[in-house]
Every structure is written in structure tokens, then in C-alpha cells.
Amino acid sequence: MRATLLLAASLLALPPAARAADVKPAIVFDLGGKFDKSFNQGVNDGALRFTKASGIEVRDFEPQNDSQREQALRKFAKAGNDPVLAVGFAQATALETVAKEFPKTRFVIIDSVVDAPNVQSVVFREEQGSYLAGVLGAMAAKDGKLGFVGGMDVPLIRRFACGYVQGAKSVRPDIEVLQNMTGTTGAAWNDPVRGGELARSQIERGAAVVFQAAGATGVGVLQATTDAGKLGIGVDSNQDQLHPGHMLTSMLKRVDVATETAFQAAKDGTWKPGVSTLGLAENGVALAFDDENASLVTPEMKARVMAAADAIKSGKVKVHDYMADQSCPM
């Protein structure tokens, strides 16, 4: 009995690195699912890379409605999964509750901040990457208008839109940017038919380039721009391959890297709670330049984008953050 107690005590005293082999990651995706070709899929890509490198399986759950988020987080924690990653700002309230119930379980949330000693929060400077998308879009549109289709009408998506407008106006101060949000509920992330309708409406009003930040809804946006012979801008994951020759670029939000890094840190024993903010300087956001859009981006256009990125990194250009004051003064 004494030997058993000593063994238990020694295991409890082990540093995190010594217990790293027990890591059992799990993911609760946002509405839209892990194959949305956008935000969720980026997270899934990072998880797959982690599994390939480590041999450790990552469990996951794809909610079909809002109420399932908290249930799934709690189920994974009860099952001993650790860390448990919550995808999307809409999971913040559920995670706040569950993290308190399981103080010894490590949690990660992407796109929101949950202030708890066992939660790592990863957020991005979407306005910076969107600014670059606006620069490139304005150059490609020449004297035409730009379009923006968001998913759910929330401050985070307004942040994308505001950065996009600011970047576009740095190239053409008089440019008009048409904007629509798909809806006000979680269903707005998974309505490609409505996304296509909104994009076609903007194109009919003169949009030559349409940027979407709309989850699976964005698939419909990009199909509509392609069908109309216009240019689309993808988001989160590299969506250039969806319609080669019709995708101007994609505004990459490296949720794949954030996911893989969080799981690897848990495995290595270096995981820490707190807030990580990833922008251009941290390679957390960027534009995609690849074979699929090489014919659409001239050296002059790319140089203008690179110069803008350098100016943002150095602080010479300040990109307004909609979420700082709930306004877009552009």
C-alpha cells in the first residue's frame, strides 16, 4: 500500500513534459463542419498534420446546432481528452462554463478570448490580412467596384470588411466597396445558395472582385464570381485551387498552424494558458500567391502588397480594428 501511494505521489510530481505521452487531443468544430473548405477545414488540416507527425489520434465532433457545443466540450473533458480545442468565437460562453467544471483539463479556443487558468486563447489580426486583400483587389478591379460578403453579422466579420475597405482606399480613395452579411444566426456560415445570390447582386452593381469571409457560405460566393467571369478572394484556408484562374488570392488565417502548435505544445509539455495574438508580424495572416493565381497577379501588384505588409509590420501604416470601437471610419 505504501509503495502504491509513493508511486502515485511521484506521478503527480512529474513535470508536464514527463506526462506528455498522455495527450489525447479533441476538437469541437464550429457550425459548417470540418470540410467547409475554409475556417473549420484549416483547423482540421492542422490536426491531420499533428496526427501524421506524432501518430496521436485527434477526436472531433461537428455540431449541428448551438446547444451541442457545450455538450461536446463536456463529453470530451469527461472522457479524459486533453487538450480540447473549441473552434470559433461562438463557443466562448460554453467553454467558460466547461473549463470551470474541469480545471485540470487544458482547453484551447480559436477566435475568442476566455480568461481562465486552463485555457489558451488564439486570436488573429484579420484586419491586417484583409487590408492586403483590399490593396490587391483594388488594383485588379482597375476602375471597377469591390464586393464583400460576410457570414454571420458579428464584429469579427466587420473587422474583415473594415480592413478590406481601408486597404482598397489606400490604392483608390474613391473606390466603392459593396457589402452584405448573410444573416444574424449560425446558419449564415452554411448557406452557399444565399452566398451566391449576394455575390451575383454585387456583380450586377459593378463589383469586379468579391472577397468572402463566410465559411461554407463562401463556396457559393466563389462559384458565382467564377460563373460571372469575375474574381473571387478566398479566406482562412487557401481556396485558390477551387477555381484556378478566377481566384485573385486567399486571405490566409493560419488556424492550421495554431491548431498543430497547440497540440504539439501539449505533447512536448510546453503548453501554456493565456492569449496569443497572430498578425502579419507573427505570420498569422497572409495572402496566397501560387500557381493558381500567378497569371492574375502582376509583379507590380505583388510588390504593392509586399510594401503594404512591410508598412503594417513596421507600424508606418495602422490598420483600424473594428472590434476596438465597433466602428469603421473609412
Region spans (language model):
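A residue-level marker of the well-folded mature domains of exported/periplasmic proteins
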Residues: A21-M330
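Bacterial N-terminal signal peptides that target proteins for export
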Residues: M1-L6
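Cleavable N-terminal signal peptides
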Residues: L7-A8, A18
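Sec/Tat signal peptide C-region and signal peptidase I cleavage site
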Residues: L14-A20
